[in-house]
Design a protein with these regions (language model features):
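A cross-family "folded-core" feature that marks the main globular domain of proteins
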Residues: 1-250
Length: 250
């Protein structure tokens, strides 16, 4: 049994679980319709609950929700629902609040005709492919609900939030990984004097190798694979570039 502490809109309320004495955001079609403060109710079928007593990367959920319009909570909830269809119960829906906060700022930027450029967008597409595909639902949702158009740069940022929800990894860490991989790619292109075709299979393979290399470097994990002498003998230029990349990561 819940008790309403605040009605957000027809599709959302903030309510206290009377058994746990903890506060939640409850989202679902019609869950707030006709509700009054202090009214008691059972959670309807198909609703999602989000605990307010938690800390997020952007601060307290309880403080965050005060500055977020309910429609952005609904949009974030819809994206997380799509994420759960792909990634199952491994998705941490607790990222609702920072995700909704990000979407709120993104919409404000779009409405002011402020274009943001994320230099890592193409890398994020490859590094976090599945997350990016789910995040693309942002475009459809914003078009249908708010009649505004978003681009791949905004989708890329949402993809990082989804990745954070899957791997219990901060968005800033995912961004750091993408940035480190981009630096490695830049070093390869500079050393070879040739750009890498981002649409090629080789690029996809290289990006994924780089991603796991960066992840291992950040945790101190070492590979039990000794091919150094062979690679130095057979591919000296490639070996030198790889050595420089590893030194740069340190």
């Amino acid at each position: 049994m819940y008790r309403v502490s605040k009605v957000l809109n027809n599709n959302g309320v903030i309510a206290i679980d009377m058994d746990e004495n903890k506060e939640y955001v409850i989202l679902g079609k019609g869950v707030g319709f006709g509700k009054k403060v202090s009214q008691r109710f059972d959670k309807p079928e198909g609703c999602t609950t989000y605990r307010l007593e938690q800390e997020t990367e952007r601060g307290s959920a309880k403080e965050l929700v005060k500055g977020i319009e309910p429609e952005y909570l609904e949009i974030a909830d819809a994206i997380l629902t799509e994420s759960q269809k792909v990634f199952g119960d491994s998705i941490d829906r607790g990222i609702l609040f920072p995700l909704a906060d990000h979407i709120s700022f993104a919409v404000a930027r779009i409405r002011r005709n402020e274009q943001i450029s994320n230099p890592l967008t193409e890398d994020i597409k490859v590094l976090f492919y599945s997350e990016f595909k789910v995040a693309e639902t942002l475009k459809t949702i914003l078009r249908e609900r708010l009649q505004i158009e978003s681009d791949d740069h905004e989708v890329g940022y949402v993809a990082l939030h989804i990745h954070s929800a899957i791997g219990d990894e901060k968005v800033s860490v995912a961004m750091q990984t993408a940035r480190a991989v981009r630096e490695c790619i830049d070093m390869i292109e500079k050393a070879t004097g040739k750009p890498i075709d981002v649409l090629s299979l080789s690029y996809n393979r290289l990006m994924n190798h780089m991603k796991y290399m960066v992840a291992r470097a950040s945790t101190g994990e070492k590979l039990n694979l000794d091919m150094n002498e062979y690679m130095l003998d057979q591919y000296p230029q490639a070996y030198k570039v790889a050595t420089d990349i590893c030194k740069n990561l340190e």
